[in-house]
Amino acid sequence: MTLQRAAQPMPVDIAEILAEQRLRDAYDDRPAYQRNDYLAWIARAKRPETRTKRITQMLDELAEGGVYMGMRHRPSRR
């Protein structure tokens, strides 16, 4: 049995921020589970401040590379 999480839609504001900061390619290079987890994590924020903080963390990790949800990770071999 394979467990699958529901695919998260890309919010317009996040797509715009990724484009503005030229991080869309870094986002797209991540494995599908990471992209989906980032969006689900951001969507679960109850307060606007929390959502903003999570978006900022995602952007920082994409810019730095080799970091996912505060943990080191090897880049995928695409």
Residue ranges and their predicted role:
Residues 1-78:
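Charge-dense, helix-prone N-terminal extensions
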